Amino acid sequence: MNLEDVKKAEFVLKDVFSKIDDICFYNSQKVINAFWKNSVNEACFNSTTGYGYGDYGRDVIEKVYADVFKCEKALVRNQFISGTHAISTALFALLRPGDTLLSITGKPYDTLDSIIGFNDNKSSLKSFNVKYEQIDLVNNDFDYNKIEEYLKNNKVKVIEIQRSIGYSTRRSISIEKLEKVIKLIKSIDKDIIVMVDNCYCEFVNIKEPTEVGADICVGSLIKNLGAGIASNGAYIAGKENLVHLCSERLNVPGEADEVGPSLGANKSFLQGLYMAPSVVASSLKTIVLASYLLENLGYDVSPRWNEERCDIVETIKFNDKDKLIKFVEGIQKGSAIDADSTPVPTKMPGYDDEIIMASGSFTQGSSIEISCDGPLRDPYIAYLQGGLTYEYGKIAILKAIEDITK
């Protein structure tokens, strides 16, 4: 496969790319309006240490995020290690002994196993007598009848919705489906807290979960909204009283969001958010191209190049362990950092299967930079995401295709 083949593919994909550009422009307007409204200025880049009292930039960033998400309050902190850390913080903040957590998108991502208590971790929600229940999706949509029946017969404190696919074969959850199920939930019990794991999904569409009724929304800054510029961190956005509880869980009761030094992160948080619409668009174009080229080579891909996307993840089903490994190795070879390194399947914290991962990124574990990973289990699916620029993404895709077609 050569650049001429890619040009032919890009001609076919021009309408899809145009729609991605339209969404990028809409979200760019949303971000810049939030910057203007909150008078973002150079003083916001100043750093604090120690307790972090009076961190002007940090406070402005959280107001900007609240406006972008059209919600009451946001907590945007470099003290969060990951999106999983932010999800854990939110769950422990919102749930109390005897409460029930209900997942309506089936089993959550593997890294939540120890948080929920599937493996009897002594620090899990289960160890605090928090009950967990789940309702699986049906044909890539919510099981509305089961959800309605369960909620009418059981008291639920928090409903968790994971929009992206994790290491599953289902489709990601659209904003339209999210809005429909939240309306159903609130019609039965308006006090149920709907929490959405929004990782990999920000700025893929023109609305975020908090715009369609979600009470709280959580995501990572080494994914979409950090745009490859933020070195770490995560956010929690939503209703003021709930975000306040989360800030007290992250920090300490009584101090909440008034402490937490930025340690020089403010500029990268602001610049990352500023660039995020464009970087997400580049990532989407990268995986759309990959979907088209790999489908034409006979591979089972999802979503297909012309299907709706709700996250930045593309799955490629290889049904072959060696092909999966070769593809991931090819992405690593096509990356900017550690291109001469070879990914090796290994056990990783939070996962039951061996994982192979290509992440030639400037920030460790960054998923918005070109990356590819997958568990070594049948049917041997590669999960491809990212691309800081479309051009670099294209180069990596071609390198990976070259490796599996030798």
For each feature predicted by the language model, list its residue ranges.
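Conserved PLP-enzyme active-site core in the AAT-like
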Residues: 2-14, 21, 31-44, 52-55, ...
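Acidic, PIN/NYN-like endoribonuclease modules and their adjacent C-terminal/linker elements
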Residues: 24-28
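Active-site-flanking structural segment that lines cofactor/substrate pockets
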Residues: 45-76
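Short, well-structured beta-strand/strand-turn elements
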Residues: 72-79, 337-341
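Conserved C-terminal alpha-helix-loop-beta "cap" of PLP-dependent enzymes
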Residues: 295-405
